UniProtKB/Swiss-Prot annotation:
Protein name from the UniProt record: Transcriptional regulator MraZ
Signal peptide from the UniProt entry: none
Subcellular location: Cytoplasm, Nucleoid
Record-stated family: Belongs to the MraZ family.
InterPro entries linked: MraZ, MraZ_C, MraZ_dom, MraZ_N, MraZ_sf, SpoVT-AbrB_dom, SpoVT-AbrB_sf
Organism: Mycoplasmopsis synoviae (strain 53)
Keyword tags: Cytoplasm, DNA-binding, Repeat, Transcription, Transcription regulation
């Protein structure tokens, strides 16, 4: 399981060192895809297969499901670590992570239990600024009271 967060810097070739705490939890090959909140998601092959199987269980006649699968599958890349323990983030994923802002070099790796989220620094910090103890409490109440 992967927890915590770390800020790292991309080099000029969009390579970034995977934090050791995360690298030790993920087994290659790795799959990098777009996430649902403007981040990218990095999964082990096992976790990516589980994620894909979940999507495959949905109604194939539903246009929204087909569009989700199309976007996920067309924006997924198999990633390997180089000898220095770095991954290269493809240009399309960089555009997704930095959508609506200038391409930057600071990236947050965020543990999401079964996978790692990759965020632009500004988006992740803006997201965290919105969460207060009271706001989180209300969000939890709403989520657990939904049917």
């Amino acid at each position: 399981m992967v927890f915590g967060q770390q800020l790292r810097n991309l080099d000029e070739k969009n390579r970034i060192a995977l934090p050791p705490a995360f690298k030790n939890k993920l087994v290659e090959p790795l799959y990098l895809t777009i996430g649902f909140d403007g981040q990218a998601d990095l999964r082990s092959e096992k976790e990516f297969e589980k994620f894909s199987a979940f999507l495959d269980q949905k109604n194939p006649f539903d246009a929204k499901i087909r569009q989700i699968k199309r976007q996920i599958n067309s924006n997924t890349f198999e990633i390997t670590l180089d000898k220095q323990g770095r991954i290269t983030i493809p240009a399309r994923i960089m555009q997704w992570i930095f959508a609506g802002e200038e391409l930057g070099k600071e990236i947050y790796f965020v543990g999401a239990k079964d996978y790692v989220e990759i965020w632009s620094k500004s988006k992740f910090e803006a997201l965290n600024e919105k969460v207060t103890p009271v706001g989180l409490e209300k969000l939890v109440e709403q989520a657990y009271n939904e049917k």
